[in-house]
């Protein structure tokens, strides 16, 4: 925090902007990966052919990691405040109104994704919104992708099979899609 506070910006950073940046660094950057990793495990448990394909060809992991995140969508919604009057999808929105952005819905949009409910580890392009978009794009997106690829590269290289060992227990939330408990069995 002291490094952030010591920085200067030509226009200055308001207290609200600083608090928002702190929240994004401390909390938001954690959610995608913390909830994305077990969601990716569930994707592979529910799709054994994809698991076998990734184990046979780890070079697919960069594309597969994005698909795992799109398919699971760890942060489902985010609220934004309109800064000016506008219209979205024919709906007028006044400056100051709160708008909920549904990443979960956007990541299953049939006008963007062919067969959006299908888990496809070869999906290209994959313009998912797991990390947001535009000025709110997640600063930790690259790190999260690297960590996902590293984890699954090791897990898949060290096992010959991952299978469910019980029913998962899910986090109940309108904001994040998470897993409290995920029993997994593996064969070395």
Residue positions per predicted region:
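Cytochrome P450
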Residues: 1-188
């Amino acid at each position: 925090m002291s490094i952030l506070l010591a920085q200067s910006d030509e226009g200055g950073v308001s207290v609200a902007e600083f608090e928002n940046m702190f929240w994004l660094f401390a909390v938001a950057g954690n959610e995608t990966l913390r909830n994305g990793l077990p969601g990716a495990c569930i994707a592979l448990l529910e799709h054994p052919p994809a698991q076998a394909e990734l184990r046979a060809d780890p070079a697919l992991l960069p594309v597969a990691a994005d698909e795992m995140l799109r398919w699971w969508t760890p942060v489902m919604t985010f609220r934004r405040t309109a800064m000016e009057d506008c219209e979205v999808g024919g709906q007028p929105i006044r400056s100051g109104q709160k708008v909920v952005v549904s990443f979960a819905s956007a990541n299953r949009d049939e006008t963007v994704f062919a067969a959006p409910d299908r888990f496809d580890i070869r999906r290209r392009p994959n313009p998912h919104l797991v990390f947001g978009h535009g000025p709110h794009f997640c600063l930790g997106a690259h790190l999260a992708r690297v960590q996902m690829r590293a984890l699954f590269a090791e897990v898949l290289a060290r096992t010959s099979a991952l299978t469910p060992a019980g029913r998962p227990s899910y986090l109940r939330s309108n904001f994040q899609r998470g897993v409290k408990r995920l029993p997994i069995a593996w064969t070395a």
